[in-house]
A protein has these predicted regions:
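Conserved loop->alpha-helix
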Residues: 1-212
Length: 212
């Protein structure tokens, strides 16, 4: 599990296209400092497994399904990516619960800078809008953010996030422009609540739940 607090801006050092897959070598001296083979590292919000390590670099394999469902398909040598190691048991939740399982992609629709922050509007698929609430959590390219506004309907839906200078400087969202595709992961708690609601008509009740 991750927290959505980016530890490092990494750089794609190499991309090798395979049969319905791709292999990326990523430069990231901070996240590789204590990494081991088989560890999980979130790359732009996608949980990936380390398959090889070199000093300051790690390699991950990305299957075709992940490439199709995320913006990782757009990455090339030189691309900057947000990196975060899996949270240790003794770590703090600086953001919110992030699984690294991308629910879909959005497209930056507008970037509106102001003196102290920048408002970014993201066009989002209609299938994800039911999970978006004002002041709720959303993960954008692996960054834990608070939804500041929600609008539109269906596939014309959008949400806005307000980015402080630290976020702009320390993540790749600082370079986002209209048309940039970003990975989105909605709050997992919202998905569990929906699932429980849909199953509320089931006759069975788990032991200990509602027992008297």
């Amino acid at each position: 599990v991750f927290t959505g607090i980016v530890e490092e801006l990494g750089v794609i050092a190499d991309r090798e296209d395979l049969t319905d897959a791709a292999r990326f070598t990523v430069r990231g001296p901070v996240v590789t400092a204590d990494a081991g083979h088989g560890d999980s590292i979130a790359v732009n919000g996608v949980c990936l497994t380390v398959v090889d390590l070199r000093p300051g670099e790690f390699t991950v394999d990305v299957m075709g399904e992940t490439l199709r469902r995320s913006s990782l398909s757009d990455l090339a040598a030189g691309s900057t990516v947000n990196l975060e190691r899996a949270m240790p048991a003794s770590g703090r939740f600086g953001g919110h619960i992030v699984q690294g399982h991308v629910d879909g992609t959005g497209t930056i629709a507008a970037v509106s800078p102001s003196e102290n922050w920048t408002i970014v509007r993201v066009a989002v698929p209609g299938t994800l809008t039911r999970y978006l609430v004002e002041k709720g959590s959303i993960t954008v390219d692996g960054v834990s953010l608070t939804v500041s506004a929600v609008g539109g309907s269906g596939d014309d839906s959008w949400f806005e996030i307000s980015l402080i200078p630290t976020t702009l400087n320390e993540t790749n969202l600082g370079a986002a422009q209209p048309g940039t595709v970003v990975n989105l992961e909605v709050d997992v708690i919202a998905k569990y609540v929906e699932r429980l609601h849909l199953g509320s008509g089931d006759s069975g009740t788990p032991d200990g739940v509602g027992a008297k």
